Amino acid sequence: MNNTEFSKIADITIAYITDTIEEQDKEASIDVDLQGDILNLDTDKGIYVINKQSAAKEIWLSSPVSGPCHFFYEQGKWKNRVGLELMAILTEELDIDFNNV
């Protein structure tokens, strides 16, 4: 994947995460703040940071629950080195259904 493709897919993914939270978080318990390539999610569990790392062609997640993790794009999914998917981790930790992507 070239840099342009990575950037487009990563931007779509971060926008999807943002939009999904805003649609499903009816109680507004998650404060969503997107600044450029960095998405901050302030929750009752702590602050999540999700950002794209163009040089590595990865999305990085810093979670107050599961810690830091890097995800690469493979077969239409963002996966970490042990095969866990970004959307599955976010679904479990935030109680928001991200599995429609």
Curated annotation (Swiss-Prot):
Record-given protein name: Iron-sulfur cluster assembly protein CyaY
Function statement: Involved in iron-sulfur (Fe-S) cluster assembly. May act as a regulator of Fe-S biogenesis.
Underlying gene: cyaY
Biological processes annotated in GO: intracellular iron ion homeostasis; iron-sulfur cluster assembly
Lineage per the UniProt record: Bacteria, Pseudomonadati, Pseudomonadota, Alphaproteobacteria, Rickettsiales
GO molecular function: 2 iron, 2 sulfur cluster binding; ferric iron binding; ferrous iron binding; ferroxidase activity; iron chaperone activity
Organism: Rickettsia akari (strain Hartford)
Family: Belongs to the frataxin family.
This protein's record includes keyword Hydrolase: no
GO cellular component: cytoplasm
Keyword annotations: Iron, Metal-binding
